[in-house]
Design a protein with these regions (language model features):
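Generic alpha-helical structural signal
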Residues: 9, 13, 50-53, 57
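Short, low-complexity N-terminal intrinsically disordered segments enriched in polar/charged residues
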Residues: 1-30
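A beta-strand edge to alpha-helix "cap/lid" segment located at domain peripheries
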Residues: 2-4, 20, 38, 43-44, ...
Length: 115
C-alpha cells in the first residue's frame, strides 16, 4: 500500500525538522532499518540504520549549528526530492544539495545525495 504524496511530504518535512533540531532519535525514526545512503549515481556510503545513526551523531557533534533550509521539494511516486541550502555554521561556505528520498511505506529506505 502506498501513502498519499502529502504523507510522504510530511514525513520528509518531519525528518528535516528533526535534523535541524539535531534530535537524533526523532530524525532516525523516519528511516528504515536497512536504509541505504549513496551519492547520486555513485558508491553507497553507508547501509543500515546503525551506520546512518553513527554518521549523523558525528555530524551533529561536529557541527552543532548545522542547519538545512528547504529551497524546493517535489514528490514523484514514492520519491521526495529536496533541494536544500546547508550551512554548517562553522564559518565554512554554505552549500546546496539535492536529497532524493525513496520511501517504502512510511519509512525512508534510500537517500541519494547530489552535491
Amino acid at each position: 500500500m502506498s501513502l498519499p504524496d502529502r504523507s510522504l511530504e510530511n514525513i520528509a518535512q518531519a525528518q528535516l525538522d528533526a535534523y535541524n533540531a539535531q534530535d537524533l532519535d526523532a530524525h532516525c525514526a523516519h528511516f528504515a532499518d536497512d536504509v541505504v545512503v549513496a551519492g547520486l549515481n555513485g558508491d553507497v556510503a553507508r547501509t543500515g540504520i546503525e551506520a546512518y545513526r553513527a554518521s549523523y551523531e558525528k555530524v551533529f557533534a561536529d557541527f552543532p549549528n548545522n542547519k538545512a533550509k528547504l529551497l524546493n521539494r517535489i514528490v514523484v511516486g514514492a520519491n521526495v526530492i529536496d533541494h536544500e541550502h546547508v550551512d554548517r555554521g562553522n564559518g565554512d561556505a554554505p552549500f546546496q544539495v539535492a536529497a532524493i528520498y525513496t520511501f517504502k511505506g512510511d519509512k525512508i529506505a534510500r537517500v541519494d545525495f547530489a552535491r
